Amino acid sequence: MKNSSIIIVIFSMVLFSCGGSGSSGGNGVVPKTSKSDVIAKLSNTNWEKECSPYNKLSSGDLTDSWNVKIKLSIDSSLKSTYRTEYFHPTDTECKSMMFNALDISKFDISGKVISEESIEANGLNETFIYNADNRDIPPNYTLIYIESEKLYFGQKSGLNLGETPETRHSSISLDNYFTKVVN
């Protein structure tokens, strides 16, 4: 019986010293972000990406990257509008726009995904509903991550090309992000 009392006392001390209830009320534990939290953070927001290289237009004789500025608006239904301004490859400060393009897509946020960099992101299924080139753009299966005033998207890595849910992008570059526009 004496051993039982000692065990109960030790257990009580350990439980008390750890905070007891497990709630996050001021004990430094940050609650995990839910899907609805991510949707709320994205709804009715505007984002922009500063001047950066873009090489998806490279072909044949033209191998240089264009430089682009991208403005992204996301409405309450998670319809996203990308307005991309293209600048000559030598215009690294994006001073004189050559042309622009408009793409509209629909975001569908899925569950938690841990990236290759151990970042807790959400899956993003993006379906394009309009683009300026009238191209048939396949759905994009990627990642989405919000940290403070920065918005990150997944990127291709190995066999994870984002073509199907099974080959969803699995990497996030913290050097490649959109900044929230505060009105």
Stretches with model-predicted labels:
Residues 170-180:
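C-terminal partner/receptor-binding element of secreted or periplasmic proteins
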Residues 166-167:
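Intrinsically disordered, proline/serine/glycine-rich low-complexity cytoplasmic regions
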Residues 27-85:
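N-terminal export/targeting and maturation segments
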Residues 1-18:
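Sec-dependent bacterial lipoprotein signal peptides
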Residues 14-42, 178-183:
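Bacterial Sec-dependent N-terminal signal peptides
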Residues 52-60, 81-163:
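Contiguous, well-ordered beta-strand patches that form the walls/edges
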